[in-house]
């Protein structure tokens, strides 16, 4: 999925920015909540 690719790309960036790790985890949590809200296809 495109959104998953975007998420992974952002996580790759956060890997090199330790001070932004918490922001990356929050972003990942929001993505998980978003996917859970999507209707199952």
Curated annotation (Swiss-Prot):
Q: What is the official name of this protein in its record?
A: ORF3c protein
Organism of provenance: Severe acute respiratory syndrome coronavirus 2 (2019-nCoV)
Query: What is this organism's lineage?
Result: Viruses, Riboviria, Orthornavirae, Pisuviricota, Pisoniviricetes
Primary role: May play a role in host modulation.
Q: Which domain of life is it from?
A: Viruses
